[in-house]
Amino acid sequence: MIKVAIVGGSGYIGGELIRLLAMHPEVEIVAVTSREYAGKKVHKVHPNLRGLNLRFTSDYNFDADVIFLAVPHGVSMKLINEFLGSAKIIDLSADFRVRKELYEKYYGKHERPELIEDFVYGLPEIHRKEIKKAELVANPGCNATAVILALYPFKDLTKEVLVDLKVSSSAGGRRENLPSIHPERSNVVRVYKPYHHRHEAEVLQETGVRAMFTVHSVDIVRGLLATIYFTFEGNEKDLLKRMLIYKDEPFIRLVVDKGGLQRYPDPKYVLGSNFVDLGLAYDEENSRVIVFSALDNLIKGGAGQAVQNMNIMFGLDETLGLGYYPLYPV
């Protein structure tokens, strides 16, 4: 069994890590840390996990094969020395995802820049071989995952794209703040970040394409939809062929048939799963390509992708513990 520790288990991503790993047939959870909730059973914070015999601890003195860092941005770089060399590490923060110059442009000063190059960017569909040999993996951001996977087949066709993102309330994490309380958050379609979103850095690093995000908060709890626009003179058939690079990927589904309830990707149809649904439309008259990407920000955009990376790092079937279909209806 793989002995697993989760550092920072009280947030939504931490809760999903506990849920997924508790059901994983090759995993034993040896520790879940939280300074605020140390000593309390995990279901006191994550009510859906009632019946799971785990308590939070503030003690980092554990014996683990892999450690998931599910702490806020800026915290992993402060904690990393506690764990380096003792276990494989999968970091779910932004601290080690992008090169030093990009980090400083989008986030500010990095406290451990010498470690950035030691981390593999944990997007399996692009970096599977590197992840397999890695000791340190930086889990991608949720928005970045959606956009990179949608854009990657077309990265040689354009140097610049516009990206419209519709994101859920859970994407903002669990910290209470006034805009996130129910009377303020309910029924909104709110411009959250009109430009210079931090996840643009990951897209630029991984595709070489400058992506200009405009992010809207919408009235859903989980899930996101990315709509990507660029111009290209061609035809829809050839564009669809490019997406076939994903035909053997276990967690990418191409939404190309236009019958039934789903004509294009919709986060409603991926909730609770590690799937990404990709689709495309081509406005031939205006030479405009529109690519769609939908995922669950807490699963493929977070905990699920981290478990997928763990599976690869330990030589397991990467779908292990993740091979279930989305919830429906929701």
Curated annotation (Swiss-Prot):
UniProt catalytic activity: [amino-group carrier protein]-C-terminal-N-(1-carboxy-5-oxopentan-1-yl)-L-glutamine + phosphate + NADP(+) = [amino-group carrier protein]-C-terminal-N-(1-carboxy-5-phosphooxy-5-oxopentan-1-yl)-L-glutamine + NADPH + H(+); [amino-group carrier protein]-C-terminal-gamma-(L-glutamyl-5-semialdehyde)-L-glutamate + phosphate + NADP(+) = [amino-group carrier protein]-C-terminal-gamma-(5-phospho-L-glutamyl)-L-glutamate + NADPH + H(+)
Molecular function GO terms recorded: N-acetyl-gamma-aminoadipyl-phosphate reductase activity; N-acetyl-gamma-glutamyl-phosphate reductase activity; NAD binding; NADP+ binding
Residue numbers binding NADP(+): 10-13, 297
Membrane spanning residue stretches: none
Superkingdom classification of source: Archaea
GO aspect biological process, one term: arginine biosynthetic process via ornithine
Catalytic residue list: 142
InterPro entries: AGPR_AS (IPR023013), AGPR_type-1 (IPR000706), LysY (IPR037535), NAD(P)-bd_dom_sf (IPR036291), NAGSA_dehydrogenase (IPR050085), Semialdehyde_DH_NAD-bd (IPR000534)
Key word NAD present: no
EC number: 1.2.1.103, 1.2.1.106
Family: Belongs to the NAGSA dehydrogenase family. Type 1 subfamily. LysY sub-subfamily.
PANTHER family xref list: [LYSW]-L-2-AMINOADIPATE_[LYSW]-L-GLUTAMATE PHOSPHATE REDUCTASE-RELATED, N-ACETYL-GAMMA-GLUTAMYL-PHOSPHATE REDUCTASE, CHLOROPLASTIC-RELATED-RELATED
HAMAP family membership: ArgC_type1, LysY
Protein name: Putative [LysW]-L-2-aminoadipate/[LysW]-L-glutamate phosphate reductase
Species whose genome carries this gene: Pyrococcus horikoshii (strain ATCC 700860 / DSM 12428 / JCM 9974 / NBRC 100139 / OT-3)
Designated gene of the protein: lysY
